[in-house]
Amino acid sequence: MQGRTPLLETLRELECEIRLLTVYARECCGCYEILRRKLDRLSGLIGEDCSRAQWQADSDDPALQALGLRLRDAAVQALCELEKHLCQGVLHEPGEMGRYLGSLLESIRGELDSAGIDADARVLFVGSGALPTSALVLAREVGAHLCCLDIDEEALGYAREIARCQGLEARMQFSSLPPAELAFSRDATHFLIASLVQQKSAVLAQIRQVMRADAKVLLRHGSGIKGLFNYPVEPAELEGWQVCAERVSQPLYDTLILEKAGR
């Protein structure tokens, strides 16, 4: 135990618990609630000042960095599984979902204002997942039109059904095709890349091929302790892009607003 920090030990426990609960939940639905609490605990740690300070102080510790990578992979997998489970409840209580979406608008207001997203926007959302709350908020509360992309067909099925239950079919479409193969990409005013998208450079390259000259990219990412729940973006991945608005910081992730360099 000597030399192990409290944060390191806490993260070790969380990784083990999240991995086990993700497996158990597939056999016993009651485990999903416990899994949700563990993910909430991880989210809480990321937002705590003391955890951030300890992460910064130990940022050169190879054991902590390796653990962070393992924990992120476990957390991302768990969240994807949990979202699919939660979708089943959402489909039975569409009214509750509507009220929840209304309350979320302020949480993404900074991104909307910085990127200029309004009712005339056409947003391509890459990595939308089974429960695409940001996309649903944009369609329901802002009036934007969206195309949600995900490589997980099961997740798309859930998301499509939730959009139908919310009466948003006219404003939301869904696809598993790459951005470069979608006609929507050429007319999109904005591209939103989820923080859980790992291959950000590949997605940026595809978007660059087809995007309008005046379109903007909202790139959600996590660095430092926020990388425990989100994939980072490296400076080299931003070659050919320029930041066109101040970085938007959220408790769990940050957002860069990008446009083509030299346009």
From Swiss-Prot:
MF terms in GO: nicotianamine synthase activity
The EC number(s) this enzyme carries: 2.5.1.-
Protein origin, superkingdom: Bacteria
Keyword Transferase: yes
Phenotypic effect of disruption: Cells lacking this gene are unable to synthesize pseudopaline and are impaired in their ability to import nickel in a minimal media, supplemented or not with nickel. Under more stringent conditions where a chelator such as EDTA is added to a minimal succinate (MS) medium, a condition that presumably mimics the chelating environment prevailing within a host or in airway mucus secretion (AMS), the deletion mutant strain is unable to import zinc, therefore reconciling the regulation of this operon by zinc with its function as a zinc importer operating in metal scarce conditions.
InterPro entries xrefs: Nicotian_synth, SAM-dependent_MTases_sf
The protein's enzyme class: transferase
Protein's GO biological process: nicotianamine biosynthetic process
Record key words, sorted: S-adenosyl-L-methionine, Transferase
Gene3D superfamilies: Vaccinia Virus protein VP39
Classification via Pfam families: NAS
Catalysed reactions listed for this entry: L-histidine + S-adenosyl-L-methionine = (2S)-2-amino-4-{[(1S)-1-carboxy-2-(1H-imidazol-4-yl)ethyl]amino}butanoate + S-methyl-5'-thioadenosine + H(+)
Subunit and partners: Interacts with CntM.
Role summary: Catalyzes the nucleophilic attack of one alpha-aminobutanoate moiety from SAM onto L-histidine to produce the intermediate (2S)-2-amino-4-{[(1S)-1-carboxy-2-(1H-imidazol-4-yl)ethyl]amino}butanoate. Functions in the biosynthesis of the metallophore pseudopaline, which is involved in the acquisition of nickel and zinc, and thus enables bacterial growth inside the host, where metal access is limited. Therefore, this enzyme probably contributes to Pseudomonas virulence. Cannot use D-histidine in place of L-histidine as substrate.
Family of the protein in this entry: Belongs to the methyltransferase superfamily. CntL family.
PANTHER family, per the entry: NICOTIANAMINE SYNTHASE 3 (PTHR32266:SF12)
Protein name: L-histidine 2-aminobutanoyltransferase
Organism field: Pseudomonas aeruginosa (strain UCBPP-PA14)
Gene name tied to this protein: cntL
